[in-house]
Design a protein with these regions (language model features):
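N-terminal glycine-rich cofactor-binding segment
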Residues: 5-21, 36-64, 79-80, 97-108
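C-terminal hydrophobic helical "lid"/dimerization subdomain
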Residues: 3, 278-326
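Glycine-rich beta-strand-centered segment in the early N-terminal region that forms part
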Residues: 21-34, 47-90, 130-134
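NAD(P)H dinucleotide-binding glycine-rich loop of Rossmann-like/cofactor-binding domains
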Residues: 86-167
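Glycine-rich phosphate-binding loop and adjacent beta-alpha segment
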Residues: 229-290, 326
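Mid-domain Rossmann-like dinucleotide-binding core that forms the NAD(H)/NADP(H) cofactor-binding site
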Residues: 75, 135-211
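A short acidic, Gly/Pro-enriched loop at the edge of an enzyme's catalytic core
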Residues: 214-222
Length: 326
């Protein structure tokens, strides 16, 4: 089978032995397509992932072989996520599922940039779902990233009618804005790139150049979906006293100045949000199926053989998001 692996400073496609169940519980699935996540790029660029690693976790796939108590059968087209919480540890009991050690240890191997992958019984029972018939394969690949966003929106715990500002209108920012709207917020998005602002508007979300936001604008919640260093200063400028800042991106390096006094005197709440629980994923799929979050036009399709170009085009901002079709 063909698979894309990290080879020093590039991603190469090579042929490897087919994978088989060999009596294991779970399923072998034939990958239809897999979205390229920002975390895949971070792992590649900063050499977090080793040579030989197969990245990719935003998977849409067809069940090829199965030995499972789950209700799926051969030929079913499914979406899945890659991490599963234990539900029993101190982190899970406090709702911090992405800090769970079991959550961190579970993954899809090889990753989704491969013709076939193995899904454990645990994956099938907890985070896999039939693909809704009204979604294309490419649209369904947003199941996992939108799950991350649903978690961030829930953690903010804003109430209906609250004002929310999304700082950074890449694919995650645009999805975040739509999810916030679906949860009843009054949403504004901002960015520096005109094409991203216009794309956001095409989804019915108010958006503007960040430099054109009125000084008097105030939001109950700020969602930092950009990793730019200036995003934190934008968040501090426009969050109301007593408001919330949701950090939903990584930065190239730690910020040099921690805004301690602003947080202290203004009673701000600053929180991070990382990865979804199975419940968040259920809600994500419902938002996609019901059309409350639309994704068509956000991603650009590439073949597996062109995966290096997909990485390069994403990193150079030629495209917003890549979808690798196998």
């Amino acid at each position: 089978m063909k698979t894309a692996v990290i080879d020093n400073d590039k991603i190469i496609v090579k042929n490897v032995d087919d994978i088989k169940l060999n009596g294991r519980k779970g399923a072998i699935v034939k990958v239809i397509g897999c979205g390229l996540c920002g975390s895949d790029i971070v792992k590649f660029v900063h050499k977090i992932a080793r040579n030989g690693t197969v990245l990719g976790h935003e998977i849409v796939a067809e069940i090829f072989d199965i030995n499972s108590a789950a209700s799926f059968k051969k030929g079913d087209v499914i979406v899945t996520s890659h991490h599963i919480p234990c539900g029993e540890c101190v982190y899970c009991k406090h709702g911090n599922v992405s800090m769970c050690e079991h959550f961190k240890s579970t993954n899809i191997r090889p990753g989704g940039f491969s013709e076939y992958v193995y899904l454990s019984e645990e994956h099938l029972q907890n985070v896999a779902h039939l693909k809704p018939e009204n979604l294309t394969d490419e649209e369904a690949s947003f199941y996992e990233p939108l799950g991350c966003i649903v978690r961030a929106v829930k953690r903010a715990n804003l109430i209906k009618g609250d004002k929310a500002l999304v700082v950074g209108l890449g694919s995650i920012g645009i999805l975040t804005a739509q999810a916030l709207r679906a949860y009843g917020c009054d949403v504004m998005g901002c960015d520096l790139l005109a094409e991203r602002i216009e794309l956001t508007k095409s989804f019915g979300i108010d958006a503007c150049d960040v430099r054109e936001l009125p000084d008097e604008y105030e939001a109950d919640g700020i969602f930092m979906t950009s990793g730019a260093d200036k995003a934190i200063s934008t968040a501090l400028k426009y969050v109301r006293n007593g408001g919330k800042i949701i950090v939903f991106s990584s930065t190239p390096s730690d910020l040099s100045a921690y805004p301690n006094n602003e947080i202290y005197y203004r009673e701000l709440t600053v929180m991070g949000s990382y990865s979804p629980s199975p419940v968040d994923l259920n809600d994500s799929l419902a938002l996609l199926k019901e059309g409350k979050v639309k994704v068509r036009g956000i991603s650009t399709e590439y073949k597996l053989d062109d995966i290096q170009k997909a990485f390069d085009d994403t990193m150079s901002n030629k495209i917003m998001k890549a979808y690798i079709k196998l």
